[in-house]
Amino acid sequence: MGQLGALLHLVDPTLPIGGFNHSNGLETFVQQGKVNSRASLEEYVQTQLMQNWIYNDGAYLSLAFDAMANHDLDRLLQLDQELAASKIARESREGSYKLGVRLLKIFIRYENHPLLSEFQQAISEKRCQGYFPIVFAMVAQAMNLDKAETLYAFYYNAAVGVVTNGVKLVPLSQMDGQDILFALRTPLAQAVENSLNPDLDWLGAATLASDIRSMQHEQLYTRLYMS
């Protein structure tokens, strides 16, 4: 039961890291009329899951989890730098490492793991940024969480964020949002299966439409979100 509690704490939406402030380009899609219904929001989140997250944040989380298990700080720093290069839009890039730094600040107070301290020192020395998926993986492994369950929780947390933001932005009913989440159960499990041993040739696969909307977000006339 202790591991379940730790995992629930790690994905708790009330963690004071600011995740609710970011739409990662969804706000642009809505303002341009590309996402305007329950069906289009469901298509959007499933596309993000199966064509973006499993090759980017999820894949790097998986690799960082393994590097943490192997006590390989150099590999963690390398993965953090590679993930930085894959995040084209400034707002999304900055948002991710700000979330990561805040997450590390919370959990390092309770998890006495030397690599967490060394990674935090590397951030302060500008040797890495501390991107959210990397830190998430490190904290999860430090708490001896199961890798597959960690990936599922990460993807589910990301999906909930998209659906919550979409319900607010379109707008849609709360029940529409719940229906979308119910429909994600099988895709989430498939995403986890695909991410347990990522294909290195697909790391950082581009999602041009999302990257463009994330960059356009900076120029929107009105904005509810920081990205």
Swiss-Prot record:
Q: Main role?
A: Required for maturation of urease via the functional incorporation of the urease nickel metallocenter.
The name this protein carries in UniProt is: Urease accessory protein UreF
Q: Keyword set for this entry?
A: Chaperone, Cytoplasm, Nickel insertion
Give this protein's Gene Ontology molecular function annotations.
Answer: nickel cation binding
Would the keyword Chaperone turn up in this protein's UniProt record? Answer: yes
| Keyword field contains Chaperone | yes
> Where is the protein situated, by its record's location annotation?
Cytoplasm
Q: Which family does it belong to?
A: Belongs to the UreF family.
How does this protein assemble? UreD, UreF and UreG form a complex that acts as a GTP-hydrolysis-dependent molecular chaperone, activating the urease apoprotein by helping to assemble the nickel containing metallocenter of UreC. The UreE protein probably delivers the nickel.
UniProt cross-references to InterPro entries, sorted A to Z: UreF, UreF_sf
Give GO cellular component annotations, separated by semicolons: cytoplasm
